[in-house]
């Protein structure tokens, strides 16, 4: 059965139920190596032109699944088999939490967008750590996206991040500090220079595992550049730009809560990424996410300084076929422009 047929069935359900159905299927598939092998043969693009060594691991292609899809590390192996060069799990919090009241996930099919107000629902660090112990070390890179519990006051947030770094640094190829989700009250207030300086200075003392910062698109370009520069100066190994947006003017019929993602945030996300890349390209690893839905868009981000890319919403609408077509399309763009390896194209438009 092709993905369009599967999607028609899944889209009969509300988005969160559909996600749980997919999660159950993906989790089941992960226990059967022959299924994973078949999926890999069909969807996973492994080409020397796209392969990169980063963070001490080989990324067979630059496209990863963004955090929020595999919140609990239940689908990690299957997502790699479906074509992703790496998988970022989470967001994980120290204690389990159920997230915000339902309904909290909404599709906007004609606009190929999603709005979510999930609120870091996850099984908690202990359970997710045990799952990762069963699948690591993996043959592909795994990132862990970490966030504070909703009940943790901002002035104690540092302790949550300390605990999470100590818990996951040996089970991940990189860690991501999430202070940019709009769905935990007060979390975005931590996107300030003094907290970021303190956080990354602490991280540097705790681990050699690369720790990255993920930022929101809802700030000025100057502010984004300043925050990211502060993080890199304090020891951040990279920047992920961007998270979902709370600019509801981008989406027709938007709710007045939660974060918007998909095609509608493409230009907003790209503008912030471009500003950060102009300042930090060559100084740190830059990962672009937000509205990437084609090889053409992926290539634009790469030419503007992205070493790696992530998708989420476009995967919901396009399925694993999209992952494959983006990676194969990137190879074609590289060849057309006379490049023999992705590294030659990264940042070519801003050098």
UniProtKB/Swiss-Prot annotation:
Keyword Methyltransferase among record annotations:
no
- Give the matching InterPro entries: Aldolase_TIM, DHO_dehydrogenase, Dihydroorotate_DH_1_2, Dihydroorotate_DH_2, Dihydroorotate_DH_cat, Dihydroorotate_DH_CS
User: What is the membrane topology here?
Assistant: Peripheral membrane protein
One Gene Ontology MF term: dihydroorotate dehydrogenase (quinone) activity
Q: What EC class does the entry list? A: oxidoreductase
The catalytic activity, as recorded, is: (S)-dihydroorotate + a quinone = orotate + a quinol
UniProt subcellular location: Cell membrane
Signal peptide coordinates: none
Q: Which residues bind FMN?
A: 67-71, 91, 145, 178, 214, 242, 262, 291, 312-313
Residue numbers binding substrate = 71, 116-120, 178, 183, 243-244
* UniProtKB keywords: Cell membrane, Flavoprotein, FMN, Membrane, Oxidoreductase, Pyrimidine biosynthesis
Cited NCBIfam families: PRK05286.1-2 (NF003645), PRK05286.2-2 (NF003649), PRK05286.2-5 (NF003652), pyrD_sub2 (TIGR01036)
UniProt record similarity statement:
Belongs to the dihydroorotate dehydrogenase family. Type 2 subfamily.
Subunit details:
Monomer.
Query: What name does UniProt use for this protein?
Result: Dihydroorotate dehydrogenase (quinone)
Question: Per the UniProt entry, what species is this protein from, by scientific name?
Answer: Nitratiruptor sp. (strain SB155-2)
Q: What is the lineage of its organism?
A: Bacteria, Pseudomonadati, Campylobacterota, Epsilonproteobacteria, Nautiliales
């Amino acid at each position: 059965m092709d993905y369009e047929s599967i999607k028609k069935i899944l889209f009969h359900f509300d988005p969160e139920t559909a996600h749980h159905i997919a999660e159950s299927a993906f989790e089941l598939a992960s226990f059967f190596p022959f299924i994973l092998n078949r999926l890999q043969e069909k969807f996973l693009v492994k080409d020397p032109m796209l392969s990169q060594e980063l963070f001490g691991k080989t990324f067979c292609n630059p496209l990863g699944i963004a955090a929020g899809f595999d919140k609990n590390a239940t689908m990690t192996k299957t997502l790699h088999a479906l074509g992703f060069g790496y998988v970022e799990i989470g967001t994980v919090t120290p204690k389990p939490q159920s997230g915000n009241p339902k309904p909290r996930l909404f599709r906007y099919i004609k606009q190929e967008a999603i709005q979510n107000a999930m609120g870091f629902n996850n099984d908690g660090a202990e359970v997710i750590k045990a799952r990762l112990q069963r699948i690591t070390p993996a043959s592909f890179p795994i990132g862990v996206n970490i966030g504070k519990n909703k009940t943790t006051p901002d002035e104690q947030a540092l302790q949550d991040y300390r605990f999470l770094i100590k818990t996951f640094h040996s089970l991940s190829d990189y860690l991501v500090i999430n202070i940019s989700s709009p769905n935990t009250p007060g979390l975005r207030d931590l996107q300030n220079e003094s907290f970021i300086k303190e956080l990354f200075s602490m991280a540097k003392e705790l681990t050699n595992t690369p720790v990255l910062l993920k930022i929101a698109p809802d700030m000025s370009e100057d502010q984004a550049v300043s925050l990211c520069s502060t993080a890199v100066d304090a020891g951040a190994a990279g920047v992920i730009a961007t998270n979902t947006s709370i600019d509801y003017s981008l989406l027709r019929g938007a709710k007045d809560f939660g974060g918007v993602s998909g095609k509608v945030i493409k230009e907003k996300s790209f503008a912030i990424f471009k500003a950060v890349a102009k300042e930090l390209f060559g100084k740190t690893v830059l990962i672009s996410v937000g509205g990437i839905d084609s090889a053409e868009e992926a290539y634009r981000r790469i030419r503007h300084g992205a070493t790696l890319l992530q998708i989420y919403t476009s995967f919901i609408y396009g399925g694993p076929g999209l992952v494959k077509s983006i990676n194969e399309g990137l190879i074609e763009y590289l060849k057309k422009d006379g490049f023999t390896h992705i590294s030659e194209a990264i940042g070519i438009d801003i050098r």
